[in-house]
């Protein structure tokens, strides 16, 4: 009998792979393995060397050595270890799920898979867990936006009895407070879950596929470890896309990460791009005191209803943000203190340059070709409504796959992946997915635009309500923007909403629920909405399909 200690086994699935390799060796009569005790007990006919056994195990990526411990003597192949130490049979083994990434989609999947009885290994190569949202995305950006909003209110509030004044601010202190809150949320929402859920474990390193059930993880110390799993989720997120502009990569340009955590305010910030992130950061920096110029390849929000981009551009220009539509940089240089951009609208100079032209999936380092996982032209992993790829047992969620790049979509996809991995059945329906851009006024959308509906041969009817007709907006002296509702003309059923309004994001979920429940605008107009609230604007806009709300008294139905 030979006793071996084995490092690297994390679940019964690992046991199965090691046992299969040892059973295949001629002369091995019986193999008993316990991953809890990290050891194997092997009975042979006496003609098998320890070196051969260790070699078979290490070929799978584990570390093995002969154990110095003692074990119960086995006198025949029919003997076995005590039942409490015996390895599980295939029928009752705990399923092992491996997850590449530790963002919102990854953790949502891990929690659901654990609830389904699985053991979960999360694999992360970055220095910190949590992914983009909590670390360098949603959370720090909303803190920055809120601080900038308060600065703007001090500088330019609408009330005649409140004196406007220049805010006294420290960018360094704002960043310090922002970083502290990021660390607090990362600890509460990610690290704490790892520490309190015994079904979850973390492996630090960068993963690549070896086959459909095996990942090779290159750890930070340079060693490699094989991770065998019954199911695998890819949740590797995305990275800022850098356009191929002559000279750009030779300059100290910012991505959103540098912009969010900067210690000083630039005098003049030029923003290449008109992505969601570009618009949010551009306005925040303007409100904190920087001169800001946006270079938009087309127009702002050109993929959305044209009225949204037109009105938001007007709001930006009113705040002093320079928006250059149909403008592209062809060359960028830096002289040590100033950037110079050559564009089709002339040369621009600035002391800081933000490049924010979108993000692309982190998939190129995964060795997806080894297993045949399908990606699209953008490198995004193609998944079905159950979040499964074309390879059975391999799933994907979040920015790395062909879905909208929103953290709540990633989390929903991760949850459904975890359910489907552990024997359940869950689909992700994005037909009423709300989206918000946290500019001020905010842009909020759900469902179809008129153009999208017409492309589907749906005849539409729509109404636009200016925010000056919403009592709460009037009371706030914040009447920029509008609410637009799109209906299927034949039925009056609401199929889309586009909103530009202060706190417009707080309105959009009500519209989403109305669309989800196939409500008509007549039914929506008949609902009770609290007075004075911004969301009452949905009711008022719905009423405009049948009457002129300017002729109604307050709260009139």
Swiss-Prot record:
Report the EC code(s) recorded for this entry: 1.16.1.1
Q: Which reaction does it catalyse?
A: Hg + NADP(+) + H(+) = Hg(2+) + NADPH
Q: Which UniProt keywords apply?
A: Disulfide bond, FAD, Flavoprotein, Mercuric resistance, Mercury, Metal-binding, NADP, Oxidoreductase, Plasmid, Redox-active center
Q: What does this protein do?
A: Resistance to Hg(2+) in bacteria appears to be governed by a specialized system which includes mercuric reductase. MerA protein is responsible for volatilizing mercury as Hg(0).
Binding, Hg(2+) = 554-555
Q: Which residue range or ranges hold the HMA domain?
A: 1-65
Taxonomic source organism: Shewanella putrefaciens
Query: Which residue pairs form cystines in this protein?
Result: 133-138
Q: How is this protein named in the record?
A: Mercuric reductase
């Amino acid at each position: 009998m030979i006793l071996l200690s084995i490092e690297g086994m994390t679940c019964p699935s690992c046991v199965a792979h090691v046992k299969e390799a040892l059973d295949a060796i001629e002369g091995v009569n019986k193999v008993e393995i316990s991953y809890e005790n990290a050891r194997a007990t092997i009975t042979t006919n006496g003609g098998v060397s320890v070196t051969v056994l260790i070699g078979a195990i290490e070929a799978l990526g584990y570390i093995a050595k002969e154990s110095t411990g003692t074990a119960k003597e086995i006198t025949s192949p029919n003997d076995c270890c005590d039942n409490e130490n015996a390895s599980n049979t295939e029928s009752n083994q705990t399923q092992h799920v491996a997850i590449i990434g530790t963002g919102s989609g990854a953790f949502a999947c891990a929690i659901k898979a654990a609830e389904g009885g699985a053991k979960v290994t999360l694999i992360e190569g970055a220095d910190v867990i949590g992914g983009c949202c909590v670390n360098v995305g949603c959370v720090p950006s909303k803190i920055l936006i809120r601080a900038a909003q308060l600065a703007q209110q001090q500088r330019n509030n609408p009330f005649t009895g409140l004196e406007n004044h220049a805010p006294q601010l420290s960018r360094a202190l704002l960043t310090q407070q922002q970083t502290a809150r990021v660390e607090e949320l990362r600890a509460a929402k990610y690290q704490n879950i790892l520490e309190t859920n015994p079904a979850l474990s973390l492996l630090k390193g960068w993963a690549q596929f070896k086959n459909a059930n095996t990942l090779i993880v290159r750890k930070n110390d340079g060693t490699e470890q094989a991770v065998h799993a019954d199911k695998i989720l890819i949740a590797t997120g995305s990275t800022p896309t850098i356009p191929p502009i002559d000279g750009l990569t030779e300059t100290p340009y910012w991505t959103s990460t540098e912009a969010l955590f900067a210690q000083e305010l630039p005098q003049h910030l030029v923003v290449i791009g008109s992505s969601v992130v570009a618009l949010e950061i551009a306005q925040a920096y303007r409100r904190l005191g920087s001169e800001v110029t946006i270079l938009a390849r087309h127009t702002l929000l050109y993929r959305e209803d044209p009225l949204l981009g037109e009105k938001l551009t007007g709001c930006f220009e009113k705040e002093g943000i320079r928006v250059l539509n149909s403008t592209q940089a062809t060359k960028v240089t830096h002289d040590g203190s100033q950037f110079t951009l050559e564009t089709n609208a002339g040369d621009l100079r600035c002391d800081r340059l933000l490049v924010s032209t979108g993000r692309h999936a982190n998939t190129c380092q995964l060795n997806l070709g080894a297993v045949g996982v399908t990606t699209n032209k953008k490198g995004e992993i193609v998944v079905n409504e159950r979040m499964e790829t074309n390879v059975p047992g391999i799933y994907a969620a979040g920015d790395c796959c062909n879905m909208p790049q929103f953290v709540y979509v990633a989390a929903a996809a991760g949850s459904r992946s975890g359910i489907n991995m552990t024997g359940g059945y869950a689909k992700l329906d994005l037909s009423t997915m709300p989206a918000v851009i946290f500019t001020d006024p905010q842009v909020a959308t759900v469902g179809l635009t008129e153009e999208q509906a017409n492309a589907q041969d749906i005849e539409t009817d729509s109404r636009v309500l200016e925010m000056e007709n919403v009592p709460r907006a009037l009371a706030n002296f914040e009447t920029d923007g509008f609410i637009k509702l799109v209906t299927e003309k034949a039925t009056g059923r609401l199929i889309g909403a586009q909103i530009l309004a202060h706190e417009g994001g707080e309105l959009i979920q009500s519209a989403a629920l109305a669309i989800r429940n196939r409500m008509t605008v007549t039914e929506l107009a008949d609902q009770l909405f609290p007075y004075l609230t911004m969301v009452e604007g949905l009711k008022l806009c719905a009423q405009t399909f049948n009457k002129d709300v300017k002729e109604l008294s307050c709260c009139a139905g």
